[in-house]
């Protein structure tokens, strides 16, 4: 595989979605992509098939499970969600880095199947800042925010299961650090030996 598979995880409010959106906006699709999940739930207002999700019928999703189509999948309440393995493999074969936006539990599943997956965890600079961001969204009641904070603390205990940790204090700095990880992974000897195979063969020819 020429491209790298990445998992990006974070508690709610850490800025994960903003970082990945900024990364995708700055880099061409020929270099990096976000994996689009399949789901059996109905589209919400503003969601488009093939952009936000691949909206799939229940029976079709279960058929894909039987075919081994998914790298990982889960049933949440009455709906299925899954990550398409063939789509990821096609992108990686083209030298494109692929990001998966999943939680630490999904990361564990994938790590067992893909040992060389690169994992990144985003942390907030403090609990106070995390709570401030959640309140600033203006979407939830104080009770819901308290539950989200409790869940966030639980999720953050798993940061040490990841290869890289980024503290999202200053957004531009965090984005630069995220890009640096991609660059460093691409420059590893094992990666360059594949990407630059023809050049290396020419340079070392007798």
Swiss-Prot record:
Q: From the Swiss-Prot or TrEMBL record, state where the protein is found.
A: Cytoplasm
* UniProt-listed Enzyme Commission number(s): 2.7.4.8
Positions of ATP binding: 10-17
Pfam families, per this entry? Guanylate_kin (PF00625)
Q: Which InterPro entries match?
A: GK/Ca_channel_bsu, Guanylate_kin-like_dom, Guanylate_kinase, Guanylate_kinase_CS, P-loop_NTPase
- Keyword ATP-binding found: yes
GO MF = ATP binding; guanylate kinase activity
Alphabetized SUPFAM superfamilies for the sequence: P-loop containing nucleoside triphosphate hydrolases
Q: What class of enzyme is it?
A: transferase
Q: Specify the Guanylate kinase-like domain's residue ranges.
A: 3-183
Listed A to Z, the keywords are: ATP-binding, Cytoplasm, Kinase, Nucleotide-binding, Transferase
Q: Does the keyword tRNA-binding apply?
A: no
Q: What is its main location?
A: cytoplasm
Catalytic activity field? GMP + ATP = GDP + ADP
User: GO CC annotation: what is one?
Assistant: cytosol
Quote the function comment for this protein.
Essential for recycling GMP and indirectly, cGMP.
The UniProt similarity line reads: Belongs to the guanylate kinase family.
Task: List the protein's name.
Answer: Guanylate kinase
Q: Which organism is it from?
A: Haemophilus ducreyi (strain 35000HP / ATCC 700724)
The record lists the lineage as: Bacteria, Pseudomonadati, Pseudomonadota, Gammaproteobacteria, Pasteurellales
Q: Which gene encodes it?
A: gmk
């Amino acid at each position: 595989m020429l491209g790298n598979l990445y998992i990006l995880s974070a508690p709610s409010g850490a800025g994960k979605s903003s970082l990945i959106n900024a990364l995708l906006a700055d880099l061409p699709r020929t270099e990096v992509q976000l994996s689009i999940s399949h789901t059996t739930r109905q589209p919400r207002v503003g969601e488009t098939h093939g952009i936000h999700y691949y909206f799939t019928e229940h029976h079709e999703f279960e058929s894909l499970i039987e075919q081994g189509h998914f790298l990982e999948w889960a049933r949440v309440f009455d709906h299925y969600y899954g990550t398409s393995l063939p789509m990821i493999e096609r992108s990686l074969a083209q030298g494109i880095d692929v990001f998966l936006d999943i939680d630490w539990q999904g990361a564990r599943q994938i790590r067992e199947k893909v040992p060389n997956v690169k994992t990144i965890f985003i942390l907030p600079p403090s609990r106070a800042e995390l709570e401030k961001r959640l309140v600033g969204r203006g979407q939830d009641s104080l009770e819901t925010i308290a539950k989200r904070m409790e869940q966030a603390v639980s999720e953050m205990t798993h940061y040490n299961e990841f290869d890289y940790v980024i503290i999202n204090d200053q957004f531009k700095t965090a984005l630069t650090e995220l890009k640096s990880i991609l660059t460093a992974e691409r420059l590893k000897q094992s990666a360059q030996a594949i990407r630059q195979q023809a050049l290396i063969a020419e340079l070392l020819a007798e």
